[in-house]
């Protein structure tokens, strides 16, 4: 995997910690930071592989040239095999929010940085996404009445900012990852889908990047099944994994009632000329689900002398080509060699961003599976 060095998402000055500005000059202890809730799992740096699809606008003024000439089209379907690094900084502390109708509340959260490279062409990584942002934990409210929620605040270099709010829950075992359809639809009429020839993997004469998917079909990396349902990649990654628990986080810029709040803001270029109501590529909605899974691995520990420590990869299984974390053993004496069970977090996500142009709404889908970038310490309980 092309290495991306990110120790933290965003570096904060030493000693910086959110809290309430005191109303008296007499020194008082800082308030304890509120719970991060499900966001406590967002610690350190994760990396992994994924897949991205986006229908891009195509125009006569700055057309994209393709290996094989195709009839004029208002769009190009871009497909990306991806490498991703997702890095989290330490929690912010107690972030006060003042209320007029209800009492004040305090939030807590973690800054993050998401960096994605296109690696469709081996040896030629291309940066396609850079997203600094915040994940914030919001306590339960009585005015408005709303349970505890999480919020993702994201800034996208193309000219879009996102506020997506939602809820979380825990399930035992593997998640049930639903299918995702990339087919565009008539704006405001999601049942009126408009499929395009570029969604047919075997058709090499369509406005698509890459245009010829033959080599990828042969390699099993971009297939018709993947175009029909990008989330199938996530299910492949976990098919043979032993997952004990899953924290599920669902967020949206337009969450379903009783939740509300959130939204999207675009720069003028994306909105287009308001007089003609013809956006260039207006982002109108984002929704995503994150599955934070606890994976149980087997690692084979050789004989070790007291004081020795070793970095070990798990015993390989059919993992769908996905990365697995490394583990570092404590300095204990091990004799004879043994296989032990260890656990580590894994983040999977499926995200849909909806763009409006030329009378249609175009789903932009991203999926990935991410594991800890640094070796995971083996806990003492693994030796019991």
Enumerate the language-model features and the residues they cover.
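Soluble ligand-binding/transfer domains with enclosed cavities or grooves
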Residues: 2-384
């Amino acid at each position: 995997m092309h290495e991306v060095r990110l120790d933290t998402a965003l570096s904060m000055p030493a000693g910086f910690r959110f809290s309430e500005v005191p109303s008296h000059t007499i020194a008082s202890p800082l308030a304890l930071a509120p719970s991060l809730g499900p966001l406590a799992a967002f610690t350190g740096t994760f990396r992994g592989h994924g897949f991205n699809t986006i229908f891009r606008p195509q125009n006569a003024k700055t057309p994209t040239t393709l290996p094989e000439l195709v009839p004029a089209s208002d769009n190009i379907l871009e497909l990306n095999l991806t490498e991703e690094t997702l890095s989290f900084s330490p929690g912010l502390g107690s972030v006060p929010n003042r209320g007029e109708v209800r009492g004040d509340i305090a939030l807590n959260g973690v800054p993050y940085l998401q960096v994605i490279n296109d690696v469709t062409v081996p040896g030629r990584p291309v940066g396609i996404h850079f997203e600094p942002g915040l994940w914030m934990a919001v306590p339960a409210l009585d005015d408005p009445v709303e349970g505890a929620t999480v919020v993702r605040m994201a800034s996208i270099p193309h000219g879009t900012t996102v506020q997506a709010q939602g809820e979380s829950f825990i399930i035992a075992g593997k998640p049930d990852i639903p299918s995702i359809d990339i087919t565009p639809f008539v704006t405001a009429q999601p049942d009126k889908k408009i499929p395009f020839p570029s969604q047919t993997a075997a058709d090499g004469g369509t406005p698509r990047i890459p245009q010829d998917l033959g080599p990828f079909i042969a390699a099993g990396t971009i297939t018709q099944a993947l175009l029909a349902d990008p989330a199938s990649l996530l299910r492949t990654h976990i098919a043979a994994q032993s997952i004990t628990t899953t924290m599920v986080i669902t967020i949206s810029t337009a969450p379903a009632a009783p939740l509300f709040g959130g939204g999207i803001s675009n720069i003028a270029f994306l909105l287009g000329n308001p007089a003609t109501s013809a956006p260039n590529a207006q982002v109108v909605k984002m929704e995503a689900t994150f599955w934070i899974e606890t994976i149980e691995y087997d690692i084979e520990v050789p004989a070790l002398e007291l004081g020795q420590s070793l970095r070990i990869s798990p015993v390989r299984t059919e993992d769908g080509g996905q990365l697995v974390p490394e583990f570092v053993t404590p300095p204990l004496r091990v004799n004879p060699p043994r296989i032990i069970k260890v656990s580590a977090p894994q983040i999977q996500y499926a995200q849909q961003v909806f763009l409006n142009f030329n009378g249609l709404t175009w789903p932009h889908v991203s999926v990935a599976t991410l594991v800890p970038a640094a070796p995971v310490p083996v806990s003492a309980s693994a030796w019991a």
